[in-house]
Amino acid sequence: MSGWPRIYYKLLNLPLSILVKSKSIPAEPAQELGLDTSRPIMYVLPYNSKADLLTLRAQCLAHDLPDPLEPLEIDGALLPRYVFIHGGPRVFTYYTPKEESVKLFHDYLDLHRSNPALDVQMVPVSVMFGRAPGREKGEDNPPLRMLNGVQKFFAISWLGRDSFVRFSPSVSLRRMADEHGTDKIIAQKLARVARMHFARQRLAAVGPRLPARQDLFNKLLASKAIARAVEDEARSKKISHEKAQQNAIALMEEIAANFSYEMIRLTDRILGFTWNRLYQGINVHNAERVRQLAHDGHEIVYVPCHRSHMDYLLLSYVLYHQGLVPPHIAAGINLNFWPAGPIFRRLGAFFIRRTFKGNKLYSTVFREYLGELFSRGYSVEYFVEGGRSRTGRLLDPKTGTLSMTIQAMLRGGTRPITLVPIYIGYEHVMEVGTYAKELRGATKEKESLPQMLKGLSKLRNLGQGYVNFGEPMPLMTYLNQHVPEWRESIDPIEAIRPAWLTPTVNSIAADLMVRINNAGAANAMNLCCTALLASRQRSLTREQLTEQLDCYLDLMRNVPYSTDSTVPAASAGELIAHALQMNKFEVEKDTIGDIIILPREQAVLMTYYRNNIAHMLIMPSLMAAIITQHRRISRDALQQHVEALYPMLKAELFLRWEREELASVIDALASEMQRQGLITLQDDELHINPTHSRTLQLLAAGARETLQRYAITFWLLSANPSINRSTLEKESRTVAQRLSVLHGINAPEFFDKAVFSSLVLTLRDEGYISDTGDAEPAETMKIYQMLADLITSDVRLTIESATQGE
């Protein structure tokens, strides 16, 4: 580029460099989209805009991509490196590819015909200033909105800092030429497909139009389901029809979101400022799969785990910065207090009560509102656990909202609904101190403005945050595979509850929890906490801690828990240095070196972070525990031990493997442990390697408390085979609390009611006990003996004497 064009673009770039601060999506386009910078690259933009072109240029130069203003020279021919699909509103008033774009596509394809070695990468790019979806009334702009010069100036002036450049996966023009030819008709089709691509992309980024709130209420009131529920309300409560209708409107006011794009923009600015000061980074993985779902027109339901009230804000912030529409979020009614409630409502929150029981009108209004969100194409987010995890582990899922999601499908909607599991991880959770108190029996504080301000005042040095998108679950595909007859239950009016609904919902919920855990994120904090809590004195030398972290990291990298889980790329030493900056640990120096200590008052709180990744290390920990206690054991015996205990572990920690996969998992982990020198293999027997026994023992300690808990329940069951389920749960907790005091176990989840409830249900499902309470003493004693060999003798004596004393 030379002469007047260069001067023109430089002059135009002066105001743009001041007004525009755009983001690239994805953050590293060349790396994440697999662009090969050694091959020619051309850019395709939706319509003619020099401002868009210069904004794209700034991002290309920032990411070491070819300059779009520099033409491509191919076989002596100079061709523009960019193509505008449409000329813009100054010339055309309807969508057809501009002839020039068709000509350029044809020129590029023709070069591929004459040069078999040529392969140009065509990269569609859309530049967006602002993300306002608009309201359903009074706006006529089409989904792919074009602005004339004056409109563009005001858009850039007002929204220049709320802009992004979205790079799409490249298309190989070589493949296009080989498969479809190079004539002008193919060039026209290519332009038409590109135009459709951009229209879809804009809809995915902006979302459907927002309804006027009163219009939405009127539509809901007119629905047959709510009209019938209003009549039932009037009849059952002996009130007038108008009064019953007012009750329904009041419920809509209580439930419905009041989405505001301006509030999203303002909050994005505030959160961007806040995150940069509180967090050292927000790590996002696998967002491209969600962008693709949105582009393909899926109705997306985000299903994250629930660690903190921060989850609401963090996930919406991440989605917004990934070029996606912030979802409508199901929030607990406890958050509907001033001023948080009105703010959350404008950010997309709709409020849900803890229980629907005994209020048919409420359940009908909520179900119809949720169905309306789906039918209009809004993405939705809800926490399938029902509440925040107090232990750091996933809670058993609550299936009410998930059931309503499937019922919405049974209304006969056309858009495919896809569930997207999400793992959210933190290096610091602001409520963790409160969680520990609640697990010890303290009453949960009601959310309020003073409590919110108190929590905000404590926010500092939060380390890293992690948002990992798991494997999506298309509901239609799932139902087609597991309930082929599901379409027979479609009813556009009534909320249908076919016989297959409850077991199917339970199965989907369990699968979602597994997929959330599959996307787990190891980090400096949870790895250091795991190692230090494994030490009985909660302290290790820096060298020992480094060695232990190396063990964990090698296990996770060389035998990954799943393809969606993430492990830090940093070294053990770098992770320890980062964790020490979090001010959770103490360092004592002596003449030999550093000793890193987890203070007693912090130990209980740090179990929360250890539990975040317990599922990722439980299998190698269990194997290490078995090998350590037996000193040497055959592969077959090791597998028998693991298979006997695995059903309980799978249910408790939502592990991913089926029983038939265990042999290959054990082999892979054993090979890695042998490679690390933790064990040796002699005549198909696994032996402890004495030179690395400390590392193996610390690894084994990760399963210690779980095995002790199982030993308690199996001993009680063996000692009293006729014990009923509720008594078994209660007595197991009592013994666990006693064990916790006598042996200094600082893990609040050790005697958590939910953990023992889940365990007893699994024992029923596995046939150890029946609904009537009768157990098979020979089988339970066999498992107890196995567990007794894996725990220390003093713990075993405490368990057995506790029941004898009664």
Curated annotation (Swiss-Prot):
Task: Please identify the protein, giving its name as recorded.
Answer: Glycerol-3-phosphate acyltransferase
The protein's topology relative to the membrane is: Peripheral membrane protein
A GO MF term:
glycerol-3-phosphate O-acyltransferase activity
Which NCBIfam families does this chain map to? Answer: plsB, PRK04974.1
The UniProt entry, under Pfam families, shows:
Acyltransferase (PF01553), GPAT_C (PF19277)
In what pathway does it function?
A: Phospholipid metabolism; CDP-diacylglycerol biosynthesis; CDP-diacylglycerol from sn-glycerol 3-phosphate: step 1/3
Q: What is its EC number?
A: 2.3.1.15
Top-level lineage group: Bacteria
Q: Does the keyword Cell inner membrane apply?
A: yes
Catalyses which reaction(s)? sn-glycerol 3-phosphate + an acyl-CoA = a 1-acyl-sn-glycero-3-phosphate + CoA
Q: Where is this motif: HXXXXD motif?
A: 306-311
Species of origin: Salmonella typhimurium (strain LT2 / SGSC1412 / ATCC 700720)
Please name the PANTHER family in this protein's record. DIHYDROXYACETONE PHOSPHATE ACYLTRANSFERASE (PTHR12563:SF17), GLYCEROL-3-PHOSPHATE ACYLTRANSFERASE (PTHR12563)
Q: Where in the cell is it found?
A: Cell inner membrane
Q: Enumerate the InterPro entries for this protein.
A: GPAT/DHAPAT, GPAT/DHAPAT_C, GPAT/DHAPAT_LPLAT, GPAT_PlsB, Plipid/glycerol_acylTrfase
Enzymatic class = transferase
